[in-house]
Design a protein with these regions (language model features):
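Generic structural signal for small/hydrophobic residues in well-ordered secondary structure
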Residues: 19, 38, 55, 84, ...
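Conserved core segment of the aminotransferase class I/II
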Residues: 221-302, 309, 313, 391
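N-terminal small-domain helix-loop-helix segment of the aminotransferase-like
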Residues: 2-103, 110, 288-291, 394
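Conserved PLP-binding catalytic core of the aspartate aminotransferase-like
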Residues: 46, 304-305, 318-350
């Protein structure tokens, strides 16, 4: 059998496996070293107890006639969809427009399958690698990078962006930590309207936004229902990185050029290749959105943002230019004129800290590293202490 030629389009060394390889090589040469990881964005704190109990009860319930359930509705249980509509969208969206998923990453792959390969896409640069890599796997070849740098306040100059079918946009952004303002999102929606493009809006980190003036959803912007869909995630919201739960919102008004409903096609695709998110995970999601659950996850998010502030302060004292960490769990650190992998290696060898090279997120990420706020407080404090003990290393 012939290999799928689209796989040959991918970088042979995906960003995070390459980081893990370098970690292993360093530890093999320095077995006594204590590495602190501020690289991959995985949550570290326990799932709040009320939510964990709901997960356990749902699991145990499967062992009884009364509690057993098999396949659920592909769109997700109605209770959870109603809760998401009410708690996250305040009535802007209806439960019928919400689809429960097994996480945003898997959902992005299915969305890429939905739109196929005979399309053009625009992607923030830097951005989460899945937008580009997943598109390449589908066979998409027309990819436009939209530079988002400190010089343009991490928002692309749309006057320089050609018309594309899809626009991937993540706010707050991974990796830069930048959260788009209302004015910026209004420009984005207007641009999509003028070009008959569809925005895939990734809101995975929306619940880290603390500035009340910054929208948490693209659907807070007038006109977005006609040009956008949105993905959401419980991973960073509630520590569900291992549980796997998310959602996608597709408005009734979102149509293709021929007037066909995007939502109808999405329902058909997911009904064909997806049996729905785990019943256990969805029970946990309902617990997250209960009053107690929301209070508990808000405290967890506050904990991570405090950690971001600790690391940011240490980096600034060293003399670095640092972005993010206020409305997102990511810090974006600039090293003018340097290569990202060189900086990664210096942090690994000098501080015994694992970071993420900015170049792995796109051409405009060269000269940056990403650091995350995900870590136990004692390790965050140790990392900050190591940083404060040094001056500029580059």
């Amino acid at each position: 059998m012939k290999r799928n030629p689209n796989m040959a389009m991918l970088n042979a060394n995906y960003l995070f496996p390459e980081i893990n390889l370098r970690k292993r090589q360093f530890l093999a040469a320095n077995p006594a070293a204590f590495l602190i990881s501020l690289g991959i964005g995985d949550t570290t704190e326990p799932i709040p107890l009320s939510i964990a109990k709901s997960l356990a009860e749902a699991s145990l319930g499967l062992g009884s006639l009364q509690g057993y359930s098999g396949y659920g509705p592909e769109q997700g249980i109605k209770t959870l969809r109603n809760q998401i509509a009410a708690k996250f969208y305040g009535g802007l969206m209806q439960a019928e427009e919400i689809f429960i998923s097994d996480g945003a990453k898997c959902e992005l792959g299915r969305l890429q399958m939905l739109f196929g390969n005979d399309i053009s896409i625009a992607v923030q640069d830097p951005a989460y690698p899945v937008y580009v890599d997943g598109s390449l796997i589908q066979g998409v070849r027309k990819i436009i990078f939209m530079p988002c740098t400190p010089e343009n306040q991490f928002f692309p100059d749309l006057s320089l962006v050609p018309r594309t079918d899809l626009i991937y946009f993540c706010s707050p952004n991974n990796p830069t930590g930048a959260a788009a303002t209302r004015s910026q999102l209004e420009k984005l929606v207007g641009f999509a309207e003028a070009n008959q493009s569809i925005i895939i809006f990734d809101s995975a980190y929306a619940h880290y936004i603390r500035d009340p003036s910054i929208p948490k959803s693209i659907f807070e912007i007038e006109g977005a229902r006609k040009v956008a869909l949105e993905t959401g995630s419980f991973s960073k919201l509630a520590g569900f990185t291992g549980v796997r739960l998310g959602w996608t919102v597709i408005p009734e008004e979102l149509k293709y050029d021929d007037g066909t409903s995007v939502k109808a096609d999405w329902n058909r695709l997911t009904s064909t290749i997806f049996n729905g998110a785990s019943n256990i995970a969805q029970a946990g999601g309902c617990a997250v959105l209960a009053e107690q659950g929301l209070e508990e996850v808000s405290r967890s998010i506050g904990f991570y943002l405090e950690s971001a502030g600790i690391i940011k302060e240490a980096l600034k004292k060293m003399g670095y230019l640092v972005f993010g960490g206020e409305n997102a769990p990511y810090l974006w650190v600039r090293f003018e004129g340097k290569k990202s992998w060189d900086i990664f290696q210096r942090f690994l060898e000098q501080f015994h800290l694992v970071t993420t090279p900015g170049s792995g997120f796109g051409p405009s990420g060269e000269g940056f590293i990403r650091m995350t706020a995900f870590g136990h407080r004692d390790t965050i404090l140790k990392a900050a202490k190591r940083l404060k003990a040094h001056h500029l290393i580059c």
